[in-house]
Amino acid sequence: MTDSSPAASPSSLKIYFRLLGYVRPYISLFLISIVGFLIFASTQPMLGYILKYFVDGLSNPEAVLFPTVPYLRDLQLLQAVPLLIILIAAWQGLGSYLGNYFLAKVSLGLVHDLRVQLFNNLLVLPNRYFDKHNSGHLISRITFNVTMVTGAATDAIKVVIREGMTVIFLFASLLFMNWKLTLVMVAILPLIAVMVRTASKKFRKQSKKIQLAMGDVTHVASETIQGYRVVRSFGGEAYEEKRFLDASQGNTDKQLRMTRTGAIYTPLLQLVIYSAMAILMFLVLYLRGDASAGDMVAYITLAGLLPKPIRQLSEVSSTIQKGVAGAESIFEQLDVEPEVDTGTVERDSVSGRLDVRNLSFTYPGTERQVLDDISFSVEPGQMVALVGRSGSGKSTLANLIPRFYHHDKGEILIDGVEVEQYKLLNLRRHIAQVTQHVTLFSDTVANNIAYGDLAGAPREDIEKAARDAYAMDFIAQLPEGLDTQVGENGVLLSGGQRQRLAIARALLKNAPLLILDEATSALDTESERHIQAALDQVMKGRTTLVIAHRLSTIEKADLILVMDQGRIVERGTHDDLLAQNGYYARLNAMGLDAPAEDIA
């Protein structure tokens, strides 16, 4: 993942307003919270006025507080001040509850919506996006970055609204009491604004670095956990310890830099505010005039209440910039154009005829042509095998048929219709695919077979698919049979067992086109014998594209395409190609059962 340049980065305000756009579904709750914070903020000046009455009451406790108000004209300061303090506290508590609770509902709902949208977005992004971004950074966005957004959407909004309104109420009261003295406080606002702006830029820049560093930590941990067998088998513990230590230390250093910025910035801001307070107190004493002691105490009290909300408003800049940096990376992903689907054709069924005409392909962002002028045809029910060394383009060709990538030139037709013209979901319903990299989910055996569109399939159909894949023999020995949990990515199963479940999933789909990408490469000899028998049966009536390096699979193909450097260099049946004594014959002489890197 790369950083956007500062010049290209959208402004913090624009990002934050976009983030707040997610508040719209909760606008009524948001308005209630604002009313609550208004109530809370209004109580701050009241405390200053209470002190005024208290000080004035020291010299005349029997003075009447509301001489012109009916029913209250006999209420003396002696009774009024304690009563008002209790009422103000209750009023403040009500405001605090309404503000905090309803804003929390808004903020948590906002973050939930954002997290769900981010995850759903991952499901529709094109394959090339996953090719360019490692899984650690993608996971970090959903976990760590969204957590940063939570801070900006909860604590930050609360502080901005509550403390911002408090500052407004206090300034309004100070202006009302003595506008000339209040101008002294106003004079420092430009300096405070400059300090906040400078610190905000630093906080945002550092926050982006922290989130990238956290993505590195997640990536290293994820790779090590997923590949723990390789780590232990090859003695990689020390290497992985060093790699994780470096990633974690980098994240720690960046966190400390941000903490240091805040540790310097906050005391400097406090020094400016309290310097203004010192000047203000001098002027209050020097220019007392005819004001009473209560007036002076009230004014100083209200002025003394200002530094706390101003300081909190300045400190919230760090939280906001963390959230803005997190939101920027989230919106960067959300703004990526999803997988393009311009197709209009939908068919309930297809016969499975496959025609590839003059197909060429280059991966986006690269210059090397992976496929060059590929042409062949497969009749319904036929089996075609792709053979060639690693990197010859076999898997790329297989991935273009279900439109995991969009081809540059040429055509791929299913039943005479270009695959780009099919609606994406409809196209993929007609294709079943099994690869050497089996993906199982942390769920039951049955749910892994009946996955996605297959969910809800009758139990007997699931059992039949498992039997046809020769998986029922080991499933029957599991503690709960089909209802046994397989663990993360099927960790509780052997490689052959995992592969058979993947094949059972493809069998249950019952699609007319079948793509087997090294589908038996992870199986032992006994397992392969069972699977091969099952595949022989299931391939009847289905168009099958097989990428394989085992002779037992290839020799039964109706057509073998021999690929090298993205081109078809030979084609024909097994016997025909051997008779030609060419490239395929040399591969066969090397042993088609050799390791995949030699021939696949």
UniProtKB/Swiss-Prot annotation:
GO terms for cellular component: plasma membrane. Residues 31-322 form the ABC transmembrane type-1 domain. It is found in: Cell inner membrane. InterPro entries: AAA+_ATPase, ABC1_TM_dom, ABC1_TM_sf, ABC_transporter-like_ATP-bd, ABC_transporter-like_CS, ABC_transpr_lipidA, P-loop_NTPase, Type_1_exporter. Keywords: ATP-binding, Cell inner membrane, Cell membrane, Lipid transport, Membrane, Nucleotide-binding, Translocase, Transmembrane, Transmembrane helix, Transport. It holds the Pfam family ABC_membrane. The chain crosses the membrane at residues 27-47, 83-103, 174-194, 267-287. ATP binds at G388, R389, S390, G391, S392, G393, K394, S395. One of its GO terms (molecular function) is ATP binding. It catalyses: ATP + H2O + lipid A-core oligosaccharideSide 1 = ADP + phosphate + lipid A-core oligosaccharideSide 2. It is a multi-pass membrane protein. Residues 354-590 form the ABC transporter domain. Belongs to the ABC transporter superfamily. Lipid exporter (TC 3.A.1.106) family. In MsbA the ATP-binding domain (NBD) and the transmembrane domain (TMD) are fused. Homodimer. NCBIfam families: MsbA_lipidA (TIGR02203). Involved in lipopolysaccharide (LPS) biosynthesis. Translocates lipid A-core from the inner to the outer leaflet of the inner membrane. Transmembrane domains (TMD) form a pore in the inner membrane and the ATP-binding domain (NBD) is responsible for energy generation. This is ATP-dependent lipid A-core flippase. It comes from Pseudomonas fluorescens (strain Pf0-1). The lineage of its organism: Bacteria, Pseudomonadati, Pseudomonadota, Gammaproteobacteria, Pseudomonadales.
